[in-house]
Amino acid sequence: MYILIISVIVLFLAYLRYFPLDYDEKKHFEEIDNQRKSDFYSVDFGKKYFNLWKKDKRNVFHSIKWFLEKKPEYNYEKGKYFPENKNIAKEELRNLTESKKDFIIWIGHNTTLIKTGEHFFLCDPVFSEKIFFTKRHTKTGIDPVILNEVFKDSKLNILITHNHYDHLDMKSLKRLKITGSIYLPAGVKKLLKGINAAEIKELGWWEHVESGSLKINFLPAQHYSHRISQSKNSSLWGSYVIETENG
């Protein structure tokens, strides 16, 4: 019996070793050109979402192979192209928010703080040192305690792009005193148990919300969604475009 189990494992690993993962750019764009135009009309088929441009053909074998493969190591040469990520003190952040200049501050990983006019947005807030057993490779540029103090009397809105753990971290959201609204993709709101905000608004592709002089648009992105508590592509993913009175 043990020999049979070991044999199955060896055969499975051998299969993964030679499982094709090569990317063919020419074939990729040929498939996009041949995509049926009717596929662009809707993104929700039978409670599952799909990419508009090209359906995802990856499966569990791709994920296992990627997990088992040796990853390229981070080195100094790559580090030279890495954006600067420094710790921002409370007074420095307060001065930035009170200035008339708009800004985008990279806080680390996928988290950014955006100021446009008198409006503030925190995109995909992640402050945890580990996300789903994976240690982060960038330090956190702003302590959430500082964010809570600086935005105590003003609205800080939250933008969530999709449900992956390194973009939607419940521990990080619970550390924030959210004074504004939360905008997120369709199907993700159910995950936000115990999160308080002035408004929690789900959006589908091409939908928008108007807030004062702002128009917050939720647009398509080539990606996917998956979480232990949500099956693959059962919730949406996307990108944001914030329109101001100046364009």
Residue spans for each PLM region:
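Short amphipathic alpha-helix with an adjacent loop that forms part of the alpha/beta core around
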Residues: 145-154, 209-212, 229-231
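Short, polar loop motifs at secondary-structure junctions
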Residues: 108, 185-191, 204-206
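Metallo-beta-lactamase
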Residues: 1-149, 243-247
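Active-site environment of divalent metal-dependent phosphoester hydrolases
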Residues: 164-168, 189-191, 207-210, 224-226
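Structural motif
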Residues: 119-121, 157, 181, 214, ...
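Active-site metal-binding motif and surrounding structural segment of the metallo-beta-lactamase
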Residues: 37, 55, 135-184, 198-199
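Catalytic core of the metallo-beta-lactamase
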Residues: 110-115, 210-247
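Binuclear metal-ion centers of metallo-dependent hydrolases, dominated by the metallo-beta-lactamase
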Residues: 2, 13, 196-212
